[in-house]
C-alpha cells in the first residue's frame, strides 16, 4: 500500500531547462534595469550638484549625488530619515529638488 512514492525518472529535462532560462532572463532583466537606473540617476544628479571649487557657496547640500560633491565645507543641518540606495529603487528620485 505504498502508492505515495514518486518516480522522478520520467521528468522531462526540457521543462527544467525552460524554467531555468525564464528565471535567468527575469533576473538578468531586473539587474540590467537596476544598473541603467543607477547610471541615469548619477548623470541626472551630476549637473545639480553645487561644487565648492570655485568658492561661490559655502553650504553644500548633496542629495543623491555625493560622489560628485565637495563636502569639506558642508555645514548644513544633519540629515534625518532613512536613506534609500538608488540601486534598490532605480529611477526614483525622493530628494528635494527645485523644478527647472
Curated annotation (Swiss-Prot):
GO terms for biological process: proton transmembrane transport. InterPro entries: InfluenzaB_glycoprotein_NB. Keywords: Glycoprotein, Hydrogen ion transport, Ion channel, Ion transport, Membrane, Signal-anchor, Transmembrane, Transmembrane helix, Transport, Viral ion channel, Virion. It is a single-pass type III membrane protein. Pfam families: NB (PF04159). GO terms for molecular function: channel activity. Residues 1-18 are virion surface. The chain crosses the membrane at residues 19-40. GO terms for cellular component: host cell membrane; membrane; virion membrane. It is found in: Virion membrane. Glycans are attached at residues 3, 7. Residues 41-100 are intravirion. Its main location: virion. Dimer. Belongs to the influenza viruses type B glycoprotein NB family. Putative viral proton channel. May play a role in virus entry. This is Glycoprotein NB. It comes from Influenza B virus (strain B/Oregon/5/1980). The lineage of its organism: Viruses, Riboviria, Orthornavirae, Negarnaviricota, Polyploviricotina. The gene is NB.
Amino acid at each position: 500500500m505504498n502508492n505515495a512514492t514518486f518516480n522522478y525518472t520520467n521528468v522531462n529535462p526540457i521543462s527544467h531547462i525552460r524554467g531555468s532560462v525564464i528565471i535567468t532572463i527575469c533576473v538578468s532583466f531586473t539587474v540590467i534595469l537596476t544598473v541603467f537606473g543607477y547610471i541615469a540617476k548619477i548623470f541626472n544628479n551630476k549637473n545639480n550638484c553645487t561644487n565648492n571649487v570655485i568658492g561661490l557657496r559655502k553650504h553644500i547640500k548633496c542629495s543623491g549625488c555625493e560622489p560628485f560633491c565637495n563636502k569639506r565645507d558642508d555645514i548644513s543641518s544633519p540629515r534625518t530619515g532613512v536613506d534609500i540606495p538608488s540601486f534598490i529603487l532605480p529611477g526614483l528620485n525622493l530628494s528635494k529638488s527645485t523644478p527647472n
